[in-house]
Amino acid sequence: MLEFSVIERGGYIPAVEKNKAFLRADGWNDYSFVTMFYLTVFDEHGEKCDIGNVKIGFVGQKEEVSTYSLIDKKFSQLPEMFFSLGESIDYYVNLSKLSDGFKHNLLKAIQDLVVWPNRLADIENESVLNTSLLRGVTLSEIHGQFARVLNGLPELSDFHFSFNRKSAPGFSDLTIPFEVTVNSMPSTNIHAFIGRNGCGKTTILNGMIGAITNPENNEYFFSENNRLIESRIPKGYFRSLVSVSFSAFDPFTPPKEQPDPAKGTQYFYIGLKNAASNSLKSLGDLRLEFISAFIGCMRVDRKRQLWLEAIKKLSSDENFSNMELISLISKYEELRRNEPQIQVDDDKFTKLFYDNIQKYLLRMSSGHAIVLFTITRLVDVVGEKSLVLFDEPEVHLHPPLLSAFLRTLSDLLDARNGVAIIATHSPVVLQEVPKSCMWKVLRSREAINIIRPDIETFGENLGVLTREVFLLEVTNSGYHHLLSQSVDSELSYETILKNYNGQIGLEGRTVLKAMIMNRDEGKVQ
């Protein structure tokens, strides 16, 4: 029979044991509740396994009573008044490596909510559950991701859903399907709308936000697609909704953030607007938000690793690489060592850390600062089945940095089983996603039509992509318009080239030759 020993922080764990589990008290004050333990087990073969952090609460628990003070120091089965939950998916990944019998006996003994999911209905109003155990974890993860990996199944899953908008004054009916296939090449976890300004891209994204934050809305809603039936997505289908927009001119006011997983889908906003005051955030506000998100990433091993991987990928941009942002981790660890009496979620720690790294933040361009802030916040809040809505990421980013950011975002979504939908007018975004994930948005008065591009978009030439999406606009503007005026003057190819002092690129010369050929054949341009 498996036996448990509960020990103090720093308590002794023997080198050799069998069928034994040790719960080392952490003492971490988790928003006033002290529930954390570190689980180490010796399986039926005597193999030692470090499993990870687990939070244990009990029915009726008050903030002033720690779990450690009440739990028996030796037991083989916790009473039903207790319940437990691993802090992250890594806890269940480590458990999945144990034999089926051993891991399930262990989890049943500590009343784990993944193997006892029916208990959630009985304890859903317990303050310790909602404040401590579900901090950073959602119900969808308990039923989905945690349960899957515990049983050795893949962490990821496909998405099959549609966004629906019913007709309203100024708008027509609209249904947009989305498909995400696990392990597809190229990745299908980033979808995009592209079209000219004013065609309705941002309006569609804002409707999606309303569909999630106001699920009773009958004008905008998401539906789940399968082969048999299409129905509205259930509550909690998306773990969280994250909207990202750094436009100061968008009239849309973001809803108030909803970070409580016990209330269903969480909502997070990344951008310039202050929803509470309907004003723009200051640079100081944005930097403090970054620091809060960075600390959130550092506190969880998996998030820390994802942040580190993201920064390494973004460092393909030379300027980004020269900032040596990975050193922020050592600055964080140094402050923790120097100020052990200050909790990392204390405002005092935030201020001290801000003072320590201010020089890194002040020397960043607006584009690099936005990328760092955005990816850090995304690592902190994106989890299983998160939906990220991004409005015009190209606004502050040059093309190489935009491409690097999109690849980093895709890898993060793959690691966290999420999906992103982007509104853009940049062909660079098209170049990074396949045709099956791209919609051209066309508008004629009230009617909005969406169609797939006629050509494959992933890795295509930017000029080809620009003509594919903006054909009419391209031929009536920019260098096309200037060349057309020269052709209309009945000048020869050589004369026009001379007039421009030979300063016409290869593609422009090809366009010019085609215009002259059509003119000379009597075709109207």
UniProtKB/Swiss-Prot annotation:
Signal peptide: none
Gene3D superfamilies from the UniProt entry: P-loop containing nucleotide triphosphate hydrolases (3.40.50.300)
SUPFAM superfamilies tied to this protein: P-loop containing nucleoside triphosphate hydrolases (SSF52540)
Gene Ontology MF term list: ATP binding; ATP hydrolysis activity
Coiled coil region boundaries: none
PANTHER family the record matches: ATP/GTP PHOSPHATASE, EXCINUCLEASE ATPASE SUBUNIT
Protein's name according to its UniProt entry: Protein ea59
